[in-house]
Amino acid sequence: RDNTYSPLALYFILDNNLIESRVEINELFNILIEETNLKKEINNLMIYKKALYNADLATESELLEILNPLISSKSVWKSHALYLLAEYFYSKNEKEKSKEFFNEIINIKNANQDIIKKTKKRLNRDFSD
């Protein structure tokens, strides 16, 4: 539960497919997020990475539950979380939900500039009337 080596160890495990069980990987994410003394934004990054790891197979409610701490905060990772949700709903052909999340990104004060660019491009390309 070292705040430097624990995240690095998890990245190594993921990069090298050393553990195949999604349950075990999620347990490791939970230990990092809940029991390791990480700086606030590093902890938020772990939450985001957990969501990325689970996005392909997660249900809507599971993904929202994972990302809720970010989307209800002022974290620098909030725009990333909203973008992930927007893309998730777009991939599920839920265009209105997707558009809502894309629009929310535009209104965030500390949103990542690359995310804002991608969002505007996506809104213009896929949601303009």
At which residue positions do the language-model features occur?
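Extracytoplasmic/periplasmic/luminal assembly and interaction segments
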Residues: 1-37
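Soluble extracytoplasmic domains of inner/organellar membrane proteins
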Residues: 17-18, 28-129
